[in-house]
Structure formats: C-alpha cells, structure tokens
Amino acid sequence: MTDKLIIFDTTLRDGEQSPGASMTKEEKIRIAKHLERMKVDVIEAGFAASSNGDFDAIHTIAGLVKDSTICSLARANDKDIQRAADALKPANSARIHTFIATSPLHMEKKLRMTPDQVFEQARLAVRFARKFTDNVEFSPEDGSRSDLDFLCRVLEAVIAEGATTINIADTVGYGVPELYGNLVKTLRERIPNSDKAIFSVHCHNDLGMAVANSLAGVKIGGARQVECTINGLGERAGNTSLEEIVMAVKTRKDYFGLDVGLDTTQIVPTSKLVSQITGFVVQPNKAVVGANAFAHASGIHQDGVLKARDTYEIMRAEDVGWTANKIVLGKLSGRNAFKQRLQELGVSLDSETELNAAFMRFKDLADRKSEIFDEDIIAIVSEESALAQEQEHYKFVSLSQRSETGEQPQAKVVFALDGKEVTGEARGNGPVDATFNAIEGEVGSGSELLLYSVNAITTGTQAQGEVTVRLSKSGRIVNGVGTDPDIVAASAKAYIAALNKLHSKDDKLNPQRS
C-alpha cells in the first residue's frame, strides 16, 4: 500500500455546483494553474458532457496544465464517456471519472433501473472508458447508503473491467466517521480484487463531518485518495476541505503515517483566489485559511506564543502561505520592482500586455493610497488577469457622485458598450443603489441582485474595498468582483463584471451528483 495520499481536487466540478459559484472558462483556467502550482495530484476540471463551455474549459486546461492529472466526470454511458475522452485529448495525464447510483433509493426513484441493470451499465461504462485511458475512476453514487452485498458485487466487476480508482461517495453527507471508515475497510477486505485499485473517499458536509469522515476513510478504511475542494466549496453545506485534509495529514504524520506532495505555501493564495472568483467569503474562524486561524487574543495565549510559538501553534502560518501585512512598494517603485515582487509572491501573468496593464493599475493605486501591501498587488493582478481574459461587452470608465444630507444621492456612471461610451445618471437610496440604477437604466438587463458584499483587502481607512455582486437572470447566477479604494467605484466595477458574464451565456446541463 502506498504511503502517499493522493489529493483529488474537484473545486472546478463539484465545487462549482454550489449555487452562485458558477465560473467562466477563464476563471477555471486561473484556478487550475494555481492548483498545478500547489502540486495537486488530480484536478477534476469539469463535466465535459454538461455544456460546450465545460468541454472547452476541460480541453483548454488539459492543454495548459502538464504537472497534474486532468480528469473529467462522465455518467455511465458511452456518449458522456466519449465526450470526456475528447475533452481530455491534449492532457499529458488524463483520467475519466464515471459514476452511477447504487443505493436502493436512487436506483428506484431517480434512475428507475433494477440492480442488475445498474450492475451491467457500470461494468460496460468502465470497459468503454478503458478504450481511451488506463486511468479510470468509478464512483458508486450514494455509496454510503447502498446495500453492502450489491456494492461489493458492482465494485468487484468494475475493477475486473479495469477501474484503477474506486471512489466511495457519501453523496448526501449521511456518514459518521467510524461507520464510514469501516465501510471502506469492509469493501477492501471483502472484494477479492480490491488490491488492483486505489480506494478513494468523497464526502459532503451536510452534518459537518466531511473532513472527519474522509480522514476516517483514510485511517480506518485504508483509502489513499481524498476528493476535496478549496475552502470546502460545494453545494448545500459543501465538500471536504482540501486545506484541512492536507494540513491534518501533514501536521499529524505521526498518526496518519502518510505523505502529501503538495506545496502548502500555495494554500492561502489559492483560497483567496477561489473566494474572490466565486464570491464566497471565507469565515474568519475557518481552519487553516480563515483570517483568525493564527490569531491569538487571549493574553495567556499571546504570552505563550511570544515565548515559544509551539505553545499554542501546531502549524506555522507561513507554511500555508500566510504573509504579514507589510508595505512592499510605493509610488516611486518601477516596473522591474513590481515584476520582481510578483515573482516572489508566486504570481504569474500570461503576457507582457497583462503585466503592463497591472503595473499601470499599481501606479494609479500608489498615487491614491500611500501604503501598498502584498494583498493590494494580488488583487490588482487578479482583476487585470480576469479583464484580459474575459470578453468585455461593458467596460467601466468613470464615476461621479453627489449627495447631501436629507436628499437621495445621485450617481453618474460612464461606461463603454462595445467600445462606445454611454452615460447613465440616476438617484437611489444610497450611493451604491444610485450607481446600480444608473448602469441598469442604460443596460436594462432585467437581472435580479442576489448579493452585495464588501470586504477590506487590507487594514486601515485607506484599504481597497473588494466588492462582490451576484446577479440572477432566467435561472442563471453569476458573480462579479471589483476592487478600488472608492467603495462605490468598486461596486460599479463589480456590477459591470457581472453583466459581462450574463452577456456571455453558457447553458449548462445540471449533472447528477457523485
């Protein structure tokens, strides 16, 4: 049995199924590059048969990412599997992940199939997938609520057909650690050919036990792959959190006895990127990546940490990518210094054009804000990278406001519509409301505002504001993000970014869950 734990990240597939977390192809590519930089073993880049957009994203990521295995989900039918294989053609290392439900409830109510039909479809699906790659994963959806004898029968058959990874899905988060761990152990013991495959765990967090169940599957059950997402992103209560799994196994190697090959210093930067793109803010007390994860307010704790860090810290903040807020550049800093700092932060841009645009944004910010922090630089680069890769139907130009006590504020927004400048003016219940009304008065998108959120990127009154706007139209939900020291300007940028995503519509098939 290998002493390495394989990390399978499904942020781009299962994580994206969280309502409001839909990502564009360009955003998926940015996250995939960060995951590769982190040395994630397997990246599930999407569900190729769900939409042309997902197919294109998988195909592009497969061509760009060379150091991680790229995976596509596929239902247990030839059409889905063929689509996955086509999307994965450019990959250095490709995996097809096929699945079918095996619980009595799912077979009867959802699939309307008999156990024998499910057995045959699972077996034939793996056989067909093996025509394209030797790396085939099979998941029995709702495996934790499946009949044990039937589950053993199905898994023995798919391993015989060539499945190299068997993923035990706790699809609805029903499992508890001891029972789930013993389920994985029992399957490995009872299935005669279980030694021919790596067993994997995939847990949801409906009862708050996704990480605990996954770790039990590893320790008790002998699983050697964990399926997880950055920040625990996922539908309902989310998925197993990658950062918590990795740091638990790494910090408690004395207990788990396993190695993880990830560069953990990339955890926090990747967490921040996913949070910014999806608009899902990380709670301050979230383990590993929360803002308070390494903060000590108690005087006793502070005294202990000052004397010896290991009195109250079992991990080092810098080991997961936390950096202290420090002034790094100023208005007199040149392009080379800016580029050098990007390299030190592990931030890459795809072209000199993007670098030049980011540098100009930096110089503009330095004229308006006396102290520039690493977080400011990362926010600038992230937004410029997104703008460079997105097709901008609308583009923010300028904003002016007027308000007086006792009167409704008025906003005037200038923005480009396919290269032609238009001006919108409106009043509202506040400056942000007036700004959105001014934009909407010219655009007439008919969208509904679902979320408006503001976060300070750094500390102090000069901090840049990062605004997330979530819009909904015709059942489609998109996020837009904008940053600026002026919160209202950041709001306008975020609203326009969301409108651009609505304009580039990609209809996606709602996949079955694993």
UniProtKB/Swiss-Prot annotation:
Binding-site residues, Mn(2+): 14, 202, 204, 239
CDD domains: DRE_TIM_IPMS
Pfam families registered for this protein in UniProt: HCS_D2, HMGL-like, LeuA_dimer
Main subcellular localisation: cytoplasm
Coiled-coil ranges per UniProt: none
Chain positions covered by the region annotation Regulatory domain: 395-514
HAMAP family documented for this protein: LeuA_type1
The protein's name in its UniProt record: 2-isopropylmalate synthase
UniProt organism field: Burkholderia ambifaria (strain MC40-6)
